[in-house]
Amino acid sequence: IPGPSTEIFSKIAKENNVVIVTSLFEKRAIGLYHNTAVVFEKDGSIAGKYRKMHIPDDPAYYEKFYFTPGDLGFNPIDTSVGKLGVLVCWDQWYPEAARLMALAGAEILIYPTAIGWESTDSEEEKLKQFTAWQTVQRGHAVANGLYVVAVNRVGFEKDWSGVTNGIQFWGQSFISG
């Protein structure tokens, strides 16, 4: 970063005069990779980035085999729309991350997320997981007195390892605060 992917999003931000938050697979060095969120300002410049700190190892989520935990800390990114506390996916389950961003001055927390149901989850488990996800996000908003933007992936992804059939991402992006 910067690179070919950031050039594309930079152009989109500038052409549409919008601030964009996107997640990228960052190759920092040979064997050193991060799940990184990059924030683009309206003029297309890179306002900042955040490297995911909490790396999951759950059925069909095998990130620990690919990603290294982030090393940039919990620092809000100044943009023309405010101070954005950008965290990535699994970071949402840790209240300390949201709190540290809020204490550092974040006005909005943004979570680019890819969460859904694993193929063997029962209907009861699906409801439990979905309710927990929404409750945690709302809790961050209430506890820290700011808005939370939870943006979640949609669609199905096969688990090529064969351990499960895959994940059905549930979408349901929302704003709370």
Predicted regions and their residues:
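Amphipathic beta-strand/beta-sheet edge segments enriched in Tyr/Trp
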Residues: L32-K52, G166-G177
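Short beta-strand-to-loop element that shapes/binds the nucleotide-sugar donor at the catalytic cleft/hinge
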Residues: T22-K27
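Active-site-proximal beta-strand elements of phosphoester/diester hydrolases
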Residues: T36, K49-K52, P76, G82-D91, ...
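Glycine-/acidic-rich phosphate or pyrophosphate-binding loops and their flanking alpha/beta elements
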Residues: F67-V81
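A generic fold-level signal
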Residues: L32, P69-D71, A143, Q168
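CN hydrolase (nitrilase-like) catalytic-core segments centered on the catalytic cysteine
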Residues: P2-V21, K83, C89-G177
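A short, polar/charged loop-to-alpha-helix boundary motif
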Residues: K52-Y66
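Metal-dependent catalytic neighborhoods of phosphoester/phosphodiester hydrolases
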Residues: I1-P2, A29-Y33
